[in-house]
Amino acid sequence: MYETFYGLKENPFNVTPDPQFIYLGKSHREALAQLLYGVKAKKGFIVMTGEVGTGKTTLIHYLLEKLNGNDDTKTAFLFNPKLTVYDFIEYILKDLGVVVQKGTKGDYLHLLHQNLLKAYQNDEKVVLIVDEAQGLNPALLEEIRLLSNLETSKSKLLQIVLVGQPELNKTLEQPGFRQLRQRINMRYHLPAFNGNETKEYIANRLRIAGAKRSIFTIGAIEEIHERTGGIPRLINILCDNSLLIGYASDKIIIDEKVVNEAANDLKLRRGIFGTWSWILLRMGRGLFGIWSWIFIGISITGVILLILQFGETGYRSYNFTGWFGGLQRLVITPLERFLQFFR
């Protein structure tokens, strides 16, 4: 809707995992490098986790593009783990291009083993990637463990990559999955973007979509990062809504006011420390930035002086076990009283 207005060839902020728009920040480059190394070195079992919306699926699609571009690699990609064990093995065979006739689970396992041995003899790698792996039921996880046993005396026949939310780690830590856990050779947790990565991510998507100029102000990008916590999916949603509001308001530049309006509509709030970092960022900019920083310096000095003067009183007024055991404090310290002024 707004593409022509902003001089774009296509929507830059779709939430679909399009490898064309991939941005490889430091953490994403590290994750990709580990995945590629794990597959090429035939490590056998790899686990990658990340919070919802951090770009795991986009990265996996990019990995699949790279792997499928090699003649010596075959891949099977499972994006819906809600299958029975029987359907799971059948799905792997079909995705590997194996002609399957209806049979028993044993028939399927034998057919899979024969095809893996054939690939090994042809010096080919076979990779199974399971997305949303936190949704795997115990029976499927056990089956995956058994599949990881398919090997020769020198090499694993099947490279397995499990990708999921942090709940996957919690599942794998359960006592019943000890044997599976011991087979994991590589782990990686994909974090959210930092502020600079958020800026580069937005610029990268706009450039690929055909933008010839800057559309978001620095303040707008900072606000986007604060509101989204650096989560790529949320960045896409907020940027898309901001452009829509800007288009409706005939604004060719998206500033932080537009982003604020879009974020409020989407109920996106700043993080625990987001409000203060937002204030500090803006105090550091503009005509009176230097006076703002002087004020901060004086405030910090005041806090230090209070600690030096009342440190003994403050120390004796707390029962430190109360921080962990729920015991009540005796009095409010001077430092806390001072900080309450800013709350």
Language-model features: where?
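C-terminal alpha-helical "lid" subdomain
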Residues: 213-214, 218-343
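Helix-loop-helix "sensor" segment of P-loop NTPases
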Residues: 98, 118-123, 127, 150-152, ...
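Conserved NTP-binding/hydrolysis module of P-loop NTPases
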Residues: 11, 73, 83-102
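A short, basic N-terminal segment
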Residues: 1-41, 306-343
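Walker A/P-loop nucleotide-binding motif
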Residues: 42-65
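Conserved catalytic segments around the Walker B and adjacent sensor/switch elements
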Residues: 45-46, 65, 69-80
